[in-house]
Amino acid sequence: MVYTKHIIVHKLKHLRQAKDYVENAEKTLVNESNEDHLTNLFPYISNPDKTMSKQLVSGHGITNVYDAANEFIATKKLKALSKGTDFNFDPQTGKVRFNVESLEKNNAVLGHHLIQSFSPDDNLTPEQIHEIGRQTILEFTGGEYEFVIATHVDREHIHNHIIFNSTNLYTGKQFDWKVIPKEKTKSGKAYDVTKNNFEKVSDKIASRYGAKIIEKSPGNSHLKYTKWQTQSIYKSQIKQRLDYLLEMSSDIEDFKRKATALNLSFDFSGKWTTYRLLDEPQMKNTRGRNLDKNRPEKYNLESIIERLETNELSLTVDEVVERYEEKVDVVKQDFDYQVTVEKGQIDHMTSKGFYLNVDFGIADRGQIFIGGYKVDQLENRDCVLYLKKNETFRLLSEKEASFTKYLTGHDLAKQLGLYNGTVPLKKEPVISTINQLVDAINFLAEHGVTEGTQFNNMESQLMSALGEAEEKLYVIDNKIMELTKIAKLLIEKESDHSQAVINELENLGVGPSIKYQDIHQELQSEKMSRKILKNKFEQTVDEINTFNEIRVTTLEENKGKIL
């Protein structure tokens, strides 16, 4: 388990005393509760009583780790020399002297102190923890900033102290530590962007060595919830449960019992009904009017009672809960793209998923974390990845952690396909809609409901979805024709470089950087998508026809019995 802490170094005295304190071991013991404990920063982190006689102290970009403070200051002096600033003429010596105190102007940041703590449960050696810290800070800073790292073993939990210079070795620029002030965040709390980047890199490197990466509790990570569990997601979950309850309840009392069983709190006392998820960290109630802009009254008490009058289905609370859990699992496991990932593309695996190597740009590489529930591992250790089109994945750059890039499921599937030469399997969203509606109709039929308003509504929705599928097939056919035309022109362009072909490609919106292989992959993906959608369309139509034949036969038989 890895915990991190960040402290800003503002004063020269926090750096300058390093050499004297390292030479005098008696002065290296400090009281951490003292507000001025950073005064002894460098000697503290390199204290031999804490670092296995200094064996676990190392640095980057400096000659002597025990004189790091002066080397940090020298780097800043070089920057000032190149700019010609902060130098004063000394009349006694007749020379120009650098004004070291100028480094503290405007409460400037001189360095950054990072602490990386590990749990004894991780079963890592001090040497491994030191290496984790070294790799983390190298990747975090891109290797462009001097640093010293010391691993302390004097406590039950081994921890790294890392101090890095705020001045870039190569450019002289200040390290940009970004914090979004509380006035600009939805949570009302400041958000430390750069510390979050550091933690992501720390987790990635530590997990390679087997350290357990735990998620912070809601109380300690409100901002985390505002990122991935936003109010809009709560609304979506509430609406999903309400729509399900409107289908599965017989009257308002039945609705209330089943809503409670699905951890959905409700309050019908006000003008607008309010709802809240009891199994999620939702703090504020959600008004029903905000769940459907076109029909704001849909989830109010009167509308619910009216809607439930059309239901013929009668199920127990336990049956409704069981079916809802199955439905949630189906939705969670649904996907838009299926991509095969070769074992060589996997950086390393953890108990919760794996880090995938992804190339971007000409010579850059990073890792993306993929949750285990999105992966099926094959016998040859390759993996099949299931992605949603619009979900996002954060790319952690190996060269510079401050570089933040997000890939959608669509972009990731495309890039992985180009890398390994496979065609991502694309599934049209309407297929999921058809599957859900067919499942719902079958469920009603299994419980003896094959007529009435409830059944007819489901049937009408299914016919609408089939119409949408038919329209999508038409769009895909046109797309395939267009891509085929472009592919032919690109092949022709490669052979004779005709200006007429180039002009025609430009008219089609195809730039000079587009190659045949790019279009070929997209074309194959569209063809596979068409095949899957067409099969689903034809299969569903056949099932509907068969069902209708059985229903007509049953009705005729029942009429005969009545007569």
Swiss-Prot record:
Cofactors, names only: Mg(2+); Mn(2+)
Keywords assigned by UniProt, alphabetized: Conjugation, Magnesium, Manganese, Metal-binding, Mobility protein, Plasmid
Residue stretches in coiled coil: none
GO molecular function per UniProt: metal ion binding
InterPro entries the record matches: Endonuclease_MobA/VirD2, LtrB_C, LtrB_central
Pfam families reported in the protein's UniProt record: Relaxase (PF03432), Relaxase_C (PF11083), Relaxase_M (PF20874)
Residues making up the signal peptide according to the UniProt record: none
Catalytic residues (positions): Y44
Binding site for Mg(2+): H159, H161
Keyword Amino-acid biosynthesis set for record: no
Family recorded in the similarity comment: Belongs to the mobilization (MOB) protein type 1 family.
Record's miscellaneous remark: The gene coding for this protein is interrupted by a group II intron, Ll.LtrB. Splicing of the intervening intron is necessary for proper protein activity and, therefore, conjugative transfer of pRS01, as the splicing event brings together the two conserved histidine residues proposed to function as ligands for the metal ion cofactor.
UniProt function note: Mediates initition of conjugal transfer of plasmid pRS01 possibly by introducing a single-stranded nick at the potential origin of transfer, to initiate single strand transfer from donor to recipient.
Protein name per the record: Group II intron-interrupted relaxase LtrB
Organism of derivation: Lactococcus lactis subsp. cremoris (Streptococcus cremoris)
